[in-house]
A protein has these predicted regions:
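Short basic helix-loop element that most often maps to the first helix and adjoining turn
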Residues: 5-26, 79-80
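DNA major-groove recognition helix of helix-turn-helix/homeodomain DNA-binding modules
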Residues: 43, 47-64
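Residue-level signal for the short linker/turn that defines the boundary of a DNA-recognition helix
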Residues: 2-5, 15-16, 31, 46-49
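Short, charged recognition helix plus adjacent turn
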Residues: 66-83
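Recognition helix of helix-turn-helix/homeodomain-like DNA-binding domains
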Residues: 26-45, 67
């Protein structure tokens, strides 16, 4: 999975909308949902500082967002929790 797919997966596990996550990391209310959609689809790449904010809000290690899935034991845990 890509960084964007990881953001979406973890956001969904946490039960947050794109807008809620965007606002929580400091994006303006009107821009929050479109910007998060850009990150999740890979049309825009979040800076490291933005990834760190997302990780803090989503309560995960930043590496869980930026490292491709399939390489971490945590991935299996998240997949199991999502069932």
């Amino acid at each position: 999975m890509s960084t964007g797919e990881n953001i979406k997966r973890i956001r969904n596990i946490r039960g947050m909308t794109q807008k809620e996550l965007g606002i929580a990391i400091g994006i303006g209310e009107e821009s929050a949902s479109p910007r998060m959609a850009q990150y999740e689809t890979g049309n825009r790449t979040p800076r490291e500082s933005m990834l760190n904010k997302m990780a803090a809000v989503l309560e995960v290690d930043p590496r869980n967002i930026s490292i491709p899935t399939g390489y971490r034991e945590e991935d299996m845990i998240y997949r199991l929790l999502a069932l």
